[in-house]
C-alpha cells in the first residue's frame, strides 16, 4: 500500500473516531496512558495510532513494537491493522510478551547460552514436582502418606509459576508471610465480638482471639515450605535441560540488565512501544517494559488498560502497574479516558458503575482527574428500553434451572436462539448449563469446546487411575476412591452389597490389611 492509499484508508477510519479516541491517536510522542473501559474501541485506536505514526513520521513499520497479553489480542490487532495498512501490517512487530522474549533469545543465542535447552512438557513438570515431594522431610506439612500423596502438585505448580511471573524469591515470600502474620493481631476479625469459650479457653468481648491467629499462622506458614521447594525445582529443570515460558522473560530481563549495549540496540530499533491490556501485565512483564524505556527522558510508550478489568490477577497480573506508570511519568504523561461505550445500553452501564464504584482501589478514587462514567454511544443501544433484572436463587441448581426455563420461555415467544446469549464467570457453569440445554433440547453454540476430561466416562477412568496410583504408592490407602468406583454402573454391583462391605470393614476396625479391596477379593473368590 503506497502512502496515498494509506492516507485515504487512515482518514476513513480516523473520521469515525470520537474526540477522546482522536486525542489518543494524535499524541504520537511521549508517554501516554489510555484508560479504555469495555466496549470503547481500544483495538481500533491502537491500529489507528500505528497508521498515524507511519503517515506522519519517517519511521518504518519495524520500528514499532506492540506487546499484547494474549495470542487472541495479537491476532485481533494484526487483523485490524492489515485492514488499514495492508501487507505492511506484517512488518509491525506485534508480539505477546513471551513471543517477544523468544525472539530476543533466538536473535542473541550467544548471550543466553540456552541452545541446549528444550521447553518442559506438562508431564515432565508434574514428574519434577513429584520428585520434590518425594524428597520432602517427614515433618513437612506438604508431605502426605495416605490417599493422593501427590495432592500438592497442582498448588506447587501454580506457586512456582507465580514466583517466576512476579520475580519473587523464596526469601521474598517468607518475608511477606512473616509480615502477614505480624499484622494479624491488628485485624478486626481476630477481636472477640462476644464472650466465647473454645477448647477450655475463655475469651471476653474485645479480647484477641489468639486461637484463631494461631490457626491462621499454621495455615499460612505452609507457604514457607512450598517456597523452599522453588530452588530445588529450578535445579531439577536445569539438570534436565528444561525451561518454561516464564523463564524466558526472566532470562531476557537478566541479559538486558547486564548488557547495556544489547538493551540499547533494542531501544534504538523500537522507537515506539505500545502495550495492550496493561492492567493484566505481571511484575516481570512490567519490568521488561520499564527496561525498554530505561534512561529515555520522554519515551514514546503508549499503554492501554482499565483497572476495572483486571482478570488475570491469579496469573500474576497486577493492576498497580497502571498506578505506578502514571506516577513514573507524572509530569510528562498524557491521560486519555475513553468514555463512549459502543457495546451496552446506558441502563447496563449505570448498573455496572453503581457496583464497581464500591471498589476504593479504582484509579478514579485516587486521581480526581480520571472520570470513568461510560456513556452508551451506539445508535442501536440508544434506542433500547430494556432494563437489567436481578434474579436471586437459593442455590446453584435452582439458578441453572431458572436460566434454562427463561430461555425456553423466550424461544416459545418466537425469539430466535442466536439472539440469546449466556455469560458466566467460570467455564464450569457453562458445562453445567449445556447439560440442562441438552435435556430441554435447546439448540446452543459454545465457543468453548467440550473438555474430554469432563465427559462422565473419562471422569470414571481418571478415578480408577487415581486409585491404582494411590494403591501402587501405599497399599490399602484409597478405600474412599474404591468406594466410589464400586458404584460405577459399568460394574453393576448392587448398592446393598457395597454397603454390606463397608459395614464389614468398619466392624473389623481396620485390622491389618483389612479394607474394601481385601473384602471384595474374598467376596469374589467365595461367590
Spans of features found by a protein language model:
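Conserved motor-region signature of P-loop NTPase helicases/translocases
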Residues: 1-79, 91, 219, 268, ...
Amino acid at each position: 500500500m503506497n502512502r496515498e492509499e494509506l492516507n485515504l484508508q487512515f482518514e476513513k477510519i480516523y473520521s469515525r473516531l470520537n474526540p477522546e479516541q482522536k486525542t489518543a491517536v494524535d499524541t504520537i510522542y511521549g508517554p501516554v496512558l489510555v484508560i479504555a473501559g469495555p466496549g470503547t474501541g481500544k483495538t481500533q485506536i491502537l491500529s489507528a495510532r500505528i497508521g498515524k505514526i507511519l503517515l506522519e513520521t519517517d519511521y518504518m513499520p519495524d520500528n514499532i513494537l506492540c506487546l499484547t497479553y494474549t495470542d487472541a489480542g495479537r491476532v485481533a490487532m494484526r487483523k485490524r491493522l492489515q485492514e488499514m495498512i495492508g501487507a505492511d501490517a506484517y512488518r509491525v512487530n506485534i508480539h505477546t510478551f513471551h513471543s517477544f522474549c523468544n525472539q530476543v533469545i533466538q536473535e542473541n543465542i550467544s548471550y543466553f547460552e540456552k541452545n541446549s535447552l528444550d521447553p518442559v512438557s506438562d508431564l515432565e513438570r508434574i514428574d519434577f514436582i513429584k520428585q520434590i515431594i518425594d524428597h520432602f522431610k517427614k515433618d513437612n506439612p506438604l508431605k502426605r502418606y495416605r490417599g493422593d500423596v501427590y495432592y500438592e502438585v497442582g498448588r506447587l505448580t501454580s506457586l512456582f509459576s507465580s514466583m517466576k511471573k512476579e520475580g519473587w524469591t523464596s526469601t521474598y515470600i517468607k518475608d511477606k508471610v512473616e509480615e502477614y502474620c505480624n499484622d494479624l493481631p491488628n485485624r478486626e476479625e481476630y477481636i472477640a465480638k462476644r464472650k466465647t469459650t473454645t477448647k477450655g479457653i475463655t475469651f471476653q468481648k474485645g479480647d484477641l482471639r489468639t486461637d484463631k491467629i494461631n490457626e491462621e499462622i499454621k495455615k499460612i506458614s505452609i507457604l514457607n515450605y512450598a517456597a523452599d521447594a522453588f530452588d530445588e525445582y529450578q535445579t531439577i529443570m536445569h539438570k534436565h535441560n528444561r525451561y518454561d515460558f516464564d523463564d524466558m522473560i526472566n532470562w531476557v530481563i537478566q541479559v538486558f540488565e547486564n548488557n547495556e549495549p544489547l538493551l540499547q540496540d533494542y531501544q534504538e530499533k523500537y522507537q515506539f512501544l505500545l502495550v495492550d491490556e496493561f492492567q493484566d501485565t505481571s511484575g516481570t512483564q512490567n519490568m521488561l517494559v520499564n527496561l525498554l524505556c530505561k534512561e529515555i527522558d520522554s519515551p514514546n510508550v503508549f499503554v492501554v488498560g482499565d483497572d476495572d478489568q483486571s482478570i488475570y490477577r491469579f496469573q500474576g497480573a497486577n493492576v498497580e502497574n497502571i498506578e505506578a506508570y502514571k506516577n513514573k511519568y507524572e509530569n510528562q504523561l498524557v491521560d486519555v479516558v475513553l468514555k463512549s461505550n459502543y457495546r451496552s445500553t446506558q441502563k447496563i452501564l449505570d448498573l455496572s458503575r453503581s457496583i464497581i464504584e464500591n471498589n476504593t482501589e479504582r484509579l478514579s478514587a485516587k486521581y480526581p482527574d480520571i472520570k470513568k462514567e461510560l456513556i452508551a454511544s451506539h445508535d442501536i443501544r440508544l434506542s433500547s428500553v430494556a432494563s437489567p433484572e436481578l434474579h436471586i436463587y437459593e442455590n446453584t441448581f435452582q439458578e441453572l434451572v431458572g436460566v434454562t426455563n427463561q430461555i425456553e420461555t423466550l424461544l416459545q415467544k418466537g425469539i430466535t436462539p442466536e439472539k440469546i446469549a449466556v455469560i458466566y464467570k467460570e467455564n464450569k457453569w457453562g458445562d453445567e448449563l449445556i447439560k440442562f440445554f441438552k435435556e430441554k433440547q435447546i439448540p446452543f453454540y459454545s465457543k468453548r469446546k467440550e473438555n474430554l476430561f469432563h465427559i462422565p466416562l473419562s471422569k470414571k477412568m481418571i478415578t480408577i487411575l487415581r486409585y491404582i496410583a494411590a494403591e501402587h504408592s501405599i497399599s490399602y490407602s484409597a478405600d474412599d476412591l474404591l468406594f466410589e468406583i464400586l458404584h460405577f454402573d459399568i460394574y453393576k454391583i448392587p448398592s446393598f452389597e457395597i454397603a454390606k462391605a463397608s459395614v464389614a470393614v468398619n466392624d473389623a476396625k481396620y485390622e491389618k490389611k483389612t479394607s474394601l479391596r481385601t473384602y471384595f477379593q474374598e467376596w469374589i473368590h467365595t461367590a
